[in-house]
Swiss-Prot record:
It comes from Lactococcus lactis subsp. lactis (Streptococcus lactis). Pfam families: Gallidermin. GO terms for molecular function: signaling receptor binding. This is Lantibiotic nisin-A. The gene is spaN. GO terms for biological process: defense response to bacterium; killing of cells of another organism. There is a cross-link at T31-C34, T36-C42, T46-C49, T48-C51 (Beta-methyllanthionine (Thr-Cys)). Keywords: Antibiotic, Antimicrobial, Bacteriocin, Lantibiotic, Plasmid, Thioether bond. NCBIfam families: lantibio_gallid.
Length: 57
């Protein structure tokens, strides 16, 4: 198994950097009546299909 088998979107930071930068990526596949909606904590009345939030700096 090589390290290229999985893309975990990891960021390496050296000691010279002044701090870490936020890189948050999340994809929500919540739909009303969706079996995974409850597992993801979605409100079934307000859940929408293929919502996504991407925050990167």
């Amino acid at each position: 198994m090589s390290t290229k088998d999985f893309n975990l979107d990891l960021v390496s930071v050296s000691k010279k950097d002044s701090g870490a930068s936020p890189r948050i990526t999340s994809i929500s596949l919540c739909t009303p009546g969706c079996k995974t909606g409850a597992l993801m904590g979605c409100n079934m009345k307000t859940a929408t299909c293929h919502c996504s939030i991407h925050v990167s700096k």
